[in-house]
From Swiss-Prot:
Pathway: Amino-acid biosynthesis; glycine biosynthesis; glycine from L-serine: step 1/1. The gene is glyA. Its main location: cytoplasm. It is an enzyme of class 2 (transferase). The modification N6-(pyridoxal phosphate)lysine is found at residue 236. This is Serine hydroxymethyltransferase.
Length: 434
């Protein structure tokens, strides 16, 4: 391809993407949208610079303003989560997790987490499964950990406390990880903290999905319930840039985390993202509680509305959800892959997802039986419970009534015309301007 043609096509594709999302319903639970101020910080000169090491101890010159911004980011994160120590250098949630693995384990050590099929994240997974099949999870593939699984209660969509206590006592892991990529309800941090202490295991809470809800005081508070460390990504319910952080209340543990991050894992830590995180953290301090409350309210409203429209919504007996996520079982509708593609044609952007019982019914991650829906981004656009009811009707038209998705896309576009700006920010503005 001619370089001039390639240049033009890339610019055109970026523009078309923004136009598409400006008239779509972005409902992927691991995504959100930043404010114009945060977006602008991402394109600042900070993105051209290096600042290896710790604030005040850099091995590069020219960092006095970078140090100030990173110091503010750390202070704001500590305030948000009411902790003593925060490292905001990890460039993602996965790297934040890897910092914990590096700081507190050695290759061959036993770690315990939920399997991917039960909501665990790939960063917690083993290198290979029990039958030798390649999984490639970060914990196993990168750190060389021997990953065993916590028990999961499919009916209640949560860690099975009693069975997990027994497994922890039997395996005596160095590390126990809670949290995951499917998390409808708070995980049993307090219930597992004593057994972790008794076997000498570090209790690590991965808050990648729910960090914004925790900061907004609308979810569990893992650091108050017994977690030793907490990691997060900063772009899901925490409406910042794609970045990461690690927090703790223990100074000795924090020093180990710092050394794991540098020199071990990070040289340049994406300073434009640190600046953007500082701004997002300030927004979260000012607006986070109101935002998180709206997110949970919208998730519950969407789940109930989908149920009322005739969908099989997971965990009805528990009120469906206490987080930003809603799970649909669409096995009877042709599976997650089919439903995801039909909804995408209607400009409703979701992702297919494994359900805990999918393996038993012969499904895989390529065509699972579930859809994982998120309301974080729609909430940032200002949508509320009434819009969740409208959206449930659009799902019904596409998946149950089998209307032409292209026709429904027009209705989606009409709905979105009322919600173009980012809310819960000091400077509201167009969400998908480019």
């Amino acid at each position: 391809m001619d370089p001039v043609e390639a240049y033009g096509r890339v610019k055109s594709s970026i523009l078309e993407h923004h136009k598409w999302f400006d008239s779509s319903l972005p409902m992927i639970a691991s995504e959100n949208v930043t404010s114009p101020a945060v977006r602008k910080a991402m394109t600042s000169d900070f993105g051209h610079r290096y600042a290896e090491g710790w604030v005040g101890e850099r091995v590069y010159a020219g960092t006095k303003y970078i140090d100030e911004v990173e110091s503010i980011a750390m202070e704001l994160v500590k305030r948000l989560f009411n902790v003593k120590f925060a490292d905001v250098r990890p460039i993602s949630g996965v790297v934040a997790n890897l910092a914990v693995y590096t700081a507190f384990t050695n290759p061959g050590d036993v770690a315990m987490a939920l399997p991917i099929t039960k909501g665990g994240h790939i960063s917690m997974g083993p290198l290979r499964g029990s039958e030798g099949q390649f999984i490639g999870g970060t914990a196993g593939a990168v750190r060389g950990l021997d990953v065993k699984y916590l028990a999961f209660d499919d009916h209640n969509m949560n860690v099975d406390v009693d069975k997990s206590i027994k497994r922890i006592e039997e395996n005596k892991p160095k590390l126990v990880i809670l949290g995951g990529s499917v998390i409808l309800f708070p995980h049993p941090v307090k219930e597992l903290s004593d057994v972790c202490k008794s076997v000498g295991a570090l209790l690590h809470y991965d808050a990648a999905h729910v960090a914004g809800l925790i900061a907004g005081k609308q979810f569990q508070q893992p650091m108050e319930e017994g977690a030793d460390v907490m990691t997060m990504s900063t772009h899901k319910t925490f409406f910042g840039p794609q970045h990461g952080a690690v927090i703790t209340n223990d100074e000795e543990k924090f020093e180990r985390i710092k050394l794991a991050n540098f020199p071990g894992l990070l040289s340049n830590h994406h300073l434009h993202s640190v600046a953007a995180l500082a701004l997002a953290a300030a927004e979260m301090l000012a607006f986070g509680e109101e935002y998180a409350r709206a997110v949970v309210r919208n998730a519950k409203a969407l789940a109930q509305a989908l149920h009322d429209e005739g969908f099989s919504v997971v965990a009805e007996h528990l009120g469906f959800t206490q987080s930003h996520q809603v799970l649909l079982d669409v096995d009877a509708l042709g599976g997650g892959h089919r439903c995801e593609k039909l909804l995408e044609e209607a400009n409703i952007i979701v992702n297919r997802n494994l359900l805990p019982w999918d393996i038993k019914r012969g499904r895989s991650f390529k065509d699972p039986g579930g859809l994982r829906l998120g309301v974080s981004e729609l909430t940032r656009l200002g949508m509320g419970e009434e819009e969740m009811k409208e959206i449930a009707k659009l799902y019904r038209k596409v998946l149950l009534d089998r209307e032409d998705p292209k026709k429904v896309a027009g209705e989606v576009s009409e709905l979105r015309k009322r919600f173009r700006n980012v809310k819960y920010a000091f400077e509201e503005g167009p969400a998908y301007e480019y």
